[in-house]
Amino acid sequence: MFDKIYRGEPTFEGAPPPTGIPWDVGQAQPRLMELEALGGITGEVLDIGCGLGENAVFLASRGYSVTALDGSPAAIERSRARAAEVGVAVTFGVADATDLTGYDGRFDTVVDSALYHCLDDDGRRAYANGLHRATRPDARWHLYCFSEGNVNGVISPMRSVSEDNTRDTLTSSGWRIDFLGPTTYLANTAALGGDDTSIPEQMRQMMSAEQLEQMADVRSRFETIVPMLDDDRLHLPFTVVHASRVD
């Protein structure tokens, strides 16, 4: 599905082509830029689920050695083009975040900007264990995912992972949670519009009644908020986790 999004193709039969990419905001995430300014990034960096590469390009421009991985070949193609346009060196690659074979003991810092909540329970456990293998002793993992909160009435457009679930997954996989709390994530609302009829039947059948109701609520709120925005950018409620690798 994600590869089709990056190629601008319909993700399901009967669906229109995407009007945009919700996480394409044309820059690094503001909270990541703050983290870097505060000294939270060190050593060899892994940007996992790098998407269009804006975070990786930003960190490389700040002098870090960055490896950026994504499961979508189309995302990596576009990320490489972006890095070349800016003139920075990033090591890009296509990889399964739940495996990471070949990357053992490589990284001191991991940045996850909206990948974690895309995985199911088994996938998140495999992912956390894989990152443990791919990192060095005392590595830090900075994780940003959808939360159950709201920002000025704006809620998550999809179901979030509970804080208890995140705590259990990370601590059972060799990670110590140093901080877990609320934050925000900048999103492109131009890609989040439409009405319920724009959700193809194939996708609707895969969603629970609760998820469909939540999406309808989000769309209703966006109808009110988006006309007030100058640039289609909106902050969504997220959870941030800063975790340390333990052995």
What do the PLM-derived regions correspond to, one by one?
Residues 102-110:
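A short acidic, Gly/Pro-enriched loop at the edge of an enzyme's catalytic core
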